[in-house]
Amino acid sequence: MKATLLVSALCALTGCSHQTQSVHLTPLPLSDITDVNAHWSPLGRNESRYPKEAILAEKMGCTSLEYVINAAGRAEQIRVLTPSEDAFSEAAMEALQQWQWQATAANSGHLPVKSQTRFEFCIEHNGQPCDTRGLAQRCPGEDMVRSTGHVYTQV
C-alpha cells in the first residue's frame, strides 16, 4: 500500500515538474487588400445582420475587425479595432466567422495573411440612401461590407 502511494506521489510530482515549451509565433504584418486577394479568394462572404436593437433605435455605426486567414481558409485571431456599439461588433464577428477563402494558385502553400475589414451599418429612411461618409473615417479598412437597415415612416 505504501509502495503504491509512494509511486503515485512520485508520478504526480514528476508530472507537475514537466514544463511545456512555449511556442513563439512571429506576428504577421497587416496585408493590404491587393496582397490578400493575391493569396486568397473568397468562397463565401455574407454581409452581417443588422442588429435588431440598433435598427429599432435607428442607430448607424461601423466596426473594423482585424483577423488572420489561416491555412484552412478561415478567419482566426479576430480582434475588434474600433470601439463601436457592442451589437455592431458582435454582428460583424458572427458574419466573419462564417466566411471562407480558397488559396489562389500563387498561394499553393496556403500561407496565412493578416487582413482587416470595415463593417458599416447604415439605415435608409423611406427609401432614401443612407449617408455613410463619416463611417469610413471612424473605422479603418480598405475592404468594406455594408449592412443596410430600412426604416419606413407613415406620412
Residue positions per predicted region:
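Sec-dependent bacterial lipoprotein signal peptides
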Residues: M1-C16
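Charge-biased low-complexity segments
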Residues: C16-V155
